[in-house]
Structures are given as structure tokens and as C-alpha cells.
Amino acid sequence: MPPKRYDDLSLLTLWPVAPDIDLAQYIYQFLTSEVGTQTEKEVYFTDSINSFPIHQLQELVNESNQSIYENIKINTALDLHELSSIIKKNTESLILKKIQNKKTNDLKPFQILSVINGLDVMFRSTLVSFTNEQAHLMLRDVMLRLRQVCNEYDCSPLTFKIILLFNRSDVMELLPKQRHSAAHQQKKMKYNNAMEGNSVGEFVGKYYCDEVAQ
């Protein structure tokens, strides 16, 4: 699991996906920590498979903090093109927040946690309409955009950090002392040409992420 404190979280972290309750608890803890301070928080959740753990989160939220739902923005991206559009929209929102902060001289900390799930599914959907090479270039472009926005907003008062969720079976090469199953090897072979021998998760983890949460 990634570090619980937002300040300890790397700019771009890969998290081998845990049970929904773990993700719900992580989001809840992020949004409810530092209550009573001036820190504002938002969660951007983007996925391709409607995987937001709403029921698990509802079990954690009580009547006194129902307002946290207002700080969660959920988007669906079926392929890399749609994900790129969402990243562009989020970036424009960050620029506006930055401009507003300068105009009002508002130095209150504003922390944004972006969670992206199903990047491998988006890549496969992109392969339906594009060649391996084109899909690979689109994936690189998406990851460079994410890397850029993290680097741009890496210090207070406005900070932006990203967690990428993948199945453990998709990132076995990044985990210590893991035995690779036959299914994992077949999956690697399937996308060998596009991912230089790696699964999507392994490619992203090796070349773009700061940390792989264990």
C-alpha cells in the first residue's frame, strides 16, 4: 500500500491493486485527514470499468462527513484518446486554480490525488482502432503528460499526485521474488511488440513511475 500521508507519497506511484475496501479506506483517509486545518483536498478518479469502490466508501462515511463526496470527481475513459482528453481537462482546471490563488493571494494548501485504474484496458481498446506502434505512442504521450503535470504541481500550495492501479499479475516483474505464472508469460508475449517485452503495467512502472507500492 502507498504511504498513508499525502506528503510521503511519491509524485507518480504504481499500486498493485488491492481489494476495494483498501482503496476505499485509502481515499477516505486522504479526504478526512487534517480535518480542522485549512488544507483543501480533491480526488480525481478515472477508470474504464466503473470500478470506483462506492459501496465500500459508503460504509466508511458517516453523517458528519457526507460532504466528502463533493470532493470526488469520477471520469470514465474507454481508451487512451479519452484518457488524454480527461488529462487535458484536469490540467486546465489546475491552471485555473493556480491563477485564482495568485489573484486572491490564497496560500491555503490544496492537495489533489488522481487515481487511474484500467490503463491496460484502455491500451487494449486503443489497439482496436490503431496499430501497435500508434497505440504505444499514445501511451507514451499520456504518461509524459501525467509526468509533466506532477512535476509542475509538486510543491505547496497546489500539489498533484497520481496513483496508477494495476492487477498484481500485470506487474509481476516489478515485485520482489515473484514466480511468474504461465498466464503471465502468455500475456507478456501477447503484447511483446508493443511493450518491448513488458506488460503495460511493467512498462509504465519501469519508465515513468517514481515508486511501486508493495
UniProtKB/Swiss-Prot annotation:
Protein name: Chromosome segregation in meiosis protein 2
GO cellular component: cytoplasm; nucleus; Shu complex; site of double-strand break
Similarity comment text for this entry: Belongs to the CSM2 family.
Provenance organism: Candida glabrata (strain ATCC 2001 / BCRC 20586 / JCM 3761 / NBRC 0622 / NRRL Y-65 / CBS 138)
InterPro entries in the record: Csm2, P-loop_NTPase
Protein localization: Cytoplasm; Nucleus
Keyword vocabulary terms for this entry: Cytoplasm, DNA damage, DNA repair, Meiosis, Nucleus
Function field: Involved in chromosome segregation during meiosis. Promotes efficient recombinational repair and functions in the protection of the genome from spontaneous and induced DNA damage like mutations and gross chromosomal rearrangements (GCRs).
